[in-house]
């Protein structure tokens, strides 16, 4: 008798995706972050669902409804802390996941990569509208500053901003629609994840060497299920440690004050995971130029497959590209630091230099390094 998991229409899909899936035998722990992102998504949807049961999307009661969740709802404090810090872990995992794809040349699976970039943009939109919901000072002013960037678009900008606000400023209508967006977007993300996996399983996983692994494959279960379970254990442990012992360390103290349109906080800044893009936005004195640079800093990921010049797929055996990759990583950390600093010297010039270096590394230096490495590998006799 044939096994049910191989014949049943639904079980067959699960079997071919998570059990009998042929996987390269040499994929490292850097490949764990895909499954961790899936776990993060499940955690966020579940905790978010329970928060939505008690939250009210009205400017008069939003802030106090969040306080009510933390004080009066059974384990409400834990659900909220897991949701708020879960977002940080989601971004930590996605940035490492993108970095791994960049380092090992996974972007040459173009469909999977492009869907991944769309996923990143959707996740950023979800996190942004979610940050507005508690209706604290930083929520309100963050929403005001970021949505105001739309007014930089020539001719239609102001109309577009007012259309998104549902009025002449960020107010009740904005909060209500942001809650609606924040509720629906995770389900759109889930659909995109399925498409992402569909395209991934068309080509199969890449591996650290970048060489075609078809000659040496092993079944996903039990080898990678147990490996993913270990990663999951680490993720849950660190998330619980953060949510239980230091839940507010990644947040902004200003968000403990209710939103006040008449009082601007001294330093308006987004959550830490947007600071690198915020630093790039601020490094250009012109409003429209800043918005374009902000968009370019994310959308540049779409053209990375076109900038691949090396004969080898992975950076594993390409020391020059490796060096540039880690300079890029350090540069992004620098931008994240600058994004959280006030707009004054020397932070302005550091931010401008780091922004120029970010685009230079991706658009010029890394493609040149690939060509140089090709030349170095050519026999010279």
Curated annotation (Swiss-Prot):
Pfam families: Cytochrom_B_C (PF00032), Cytochrome_B (PF00033). Gene3D superfamilies: Cytochrome Bc1 Complex, Chain C. Keywords: Electron transport, Heme, Iron, Membrane, Metal-binding, Mitochondrion, Mitochondrion inner membrane, Respiratory chain, Transmembrane, Transmembrane helix, Transport, Ubiquinone. It comes from the Eukaryota. GO terms for biological process: mitochondrial electron transport, ubiquinol to cytochrome c. The chain crosses the membrane at residues 33-53, 77-98, 113-133, 178-198, 226-246, 288-308, 320-340, 347-367. Disulfide bonds: none annotated. Heme b b562 binds at residues 83, 182. Its main location: mitochondrion. Its cofactor is heme b. Binds 2 heme b groups non-covalently. Heme 1 (or BL or b562) is low-potential and absorbs at about 562 nm, and heme 2 (or BH or b566) is high-potential and absorbs at about 566 nm. Belongs to the cytochrome b family. The cytochrome bc1 complex contains 11 subunits: 3 respiratory subunits (MT-CYB, CYC1 and UQCRFS1), 2 core proteins (UQCRC1 and UQCRC2) and 6 low-molecular weight proteins (UQCRH/QCR6, UQCRB/QCR7, UQCRQ/QCR8, UQCR10/QCR9, UQCR11/QCR10 and a cleavage product of UQCRFS1). This cytochrome bc1 complex then forms a dimer. This is Cytochrome b. It comes from Planigale ingrami.
